[in-house]
From Swiss-Prot:
The lineage of its organism: Bacteria, Bacillati, Bacillota, Bacilli, Lactobacillales. Catalyzes the formation of S-adenosylmethionine (AdoMet) from methionine and ATP. The overall synthetic reaction is composed of two sequential steps, AdoMet formation and the subsequent tripolyphosphate hydrolysis which occurs prior to release of AdoMet from the enzyme. Binds 2 divalent ions per subunit. Binds 1 potassium ion per subunit. Pathway: Amino-acid biosynthesis; S-adenosyl-L-methionine biosynthesis; S-adenosyl-L-methionine from L-methionine: step 1/1. Homotetramer; dimer of dimers. Its cofactor is Mg(2+); K(+). One of its GO terms (molecular function) is methionine adenosyltransferase activity. This is S-adenosylmethionine synthase.
């Protein structure tokens, strides 16, 4: 009998405290980019019972009503009742945003490659906003080329939110978490779901029996394909027995604390940098999107079944200091050839990434819950597979 291989990933709903913070930060970023596409933004948010603090650094010509953006975001998530302990109408909003450090701006606005040079490539003008390493990943486990555990975990909490907002399950409240354990065979292919954990905030008047029944019938059975479920699959639904107090009333939330939820559920490595509240000159965000774009196109081109791409940058320098492609033995060509193709086809300078993926637009609030990668419900440029032919042509020419 072969040994079981299990892998687990989690997700959280848009009403989770950390995700409220992420969405507020990205809503502020979008509001600024609507007026000033060249703005530099690093907006952080902290939420807790009755209060929201927004702080960070920005350089922009835009005027944004932070108070209005915060309250609208909270209302759209669903915190619209005083009994939740955190509501759009009554929450205190405390903004504290200052101008970006001129020392940092110097390197971002004029990259090392062009300082003192008379001949300048416009795409060399923007240096990386910080040093760092970023990873992108793709695998052929799902149609969107994502690991199955995180894909299912996102879908479960998204389904809970849809049922709440549509009014089908009126007792649901905004905060929720999911966790999915998938069993893999000896060839690392997913064969079944071993366990599902769902914790969802609810009104005090619903019974546990009703909640369990609804979550299994309307969420789990609707989201997880039946061939992954069997009589050995374990369901843990609100295992504490009660989840009435939630959101910022139950736990404080902070921007950037769900970086594994935002990416690949732990299935791939992570460079450590968060995304939300940051404009695209911050390579923590833009280069992570570029790395996903590269990895997804490589798998879509049938050049590998599983790919991890690492990029790394120095602050104030446009060109990446390293590019690495790892196919985990699934590639049909040498990794050195893939790396050469990546360098030829994808412009990985910050300005090149911004142009390639059109990242000066206000598209970020929609990414701040249910994952930045593998989304099928919204059109994100780094999820497109429009470089497949270019990759195939490059490899054929070798």
């Amino acid at each position: 009998m072969s040994e079981r291989k299990l892998f687990t990933s989690e997700s959280v709903s848009e009403g989770h405290p950390d995700k409220i913070a992420d969405q507020i930060s990205d809503a502020i970023l979008d509001a600024i980019l609507e007026q000033d596409p060249d703005a530099h933004v690093a907006a952080e948010t902290a939420v807790y019972t009755g209060s929201v603090h927004v702080f960070g650094e920005i350089s922009t010509t835009a005027y944004v009503d932070i108070n209005r953006v915060v309250r609208n975001t909270i209302a759209e998530i669903g915190y619209d009742k005083a009994e939740y302990g955190f509501s759009a109408e009554s929450v205190g909003v405390h903004p504290s945003l200052v101008e970006q450090s001129p020392d940092i701006a110097q390197g971002v606005n004029e990259a090392l490659e062009v300082r003192g040079s008379l001949e300048q490539d416009p795409l060399d003008l923007i240096g990386a906003g910080d040093q760092g390493l970023m990873f992108g990943f793709a695998v052929d486990e799902t149609p969107e080329l994502m690991p199955l555990p995180i894909s299912l975990a996102h879908q479960l909490v998204k389904k809970l939110t849809d049922l709440r907002k549509s009014g089908e399950l009126t007792y649901l409240r905004p905060d929720a978490k999911s966790q999915v354990t998938v069993e893999y065979d000896e060839n690392n292919q997913p064969i079944r779901v071993d366990a599902v954990v769902i914790s969802t905030q609810h009104d005090p008047n619903v019974t546990n029996d009703q909640l369990h029944k609804d979550v299994i019938e309307k969420v789990i059975n609707e989201v997880i394909p039946s061939h992954y479920l069997d009589d050995q699959t374990k369901f843990f639904i609100n295992p504490t027995g009660r989840f009435v107090i939630g959101g910022p009333q139950g736990d404080s939330g902070l921007t950037g604390r769900k970086i594994i939820v935002d990416t690949y559920g732990g299935y791939s490595r992570h460079g450590g940098g968060a995304f939300s509240g940051k404009d695209a000159t911050k390579v923590d965000r833009s280069a992570s999107y570029a790395a996903r774009y590269i990895a997804k196109n490589i798998v879509a081109a049938d050049l590998a079944k599983k790919v991890e791409v690492q990029l790394a940058y120095a602050i104030g320098v446009a060109q990446p200091v390293s590019v690495r492609v790892d196919t985990f033995g699934t590639g049909v060509i040498a990794e050195a050839d893939l790396e050469a193709a990546v360098r030829q086809i994808f412009d990985l300078r910050p300005a090149g990434i911004i142009n390639m993926l059109d990242l000066k637009r206000p598209i970020y609030r929609q990414t701040a819950a249910y994952g930045h990668m593998g989304r099928t419900d919204i059109d994100l440029p780094w999820e497109r597979v429009d470089k497949v032919q270019a990759l195939k042509d490059f490899i054929a020419s070798k």
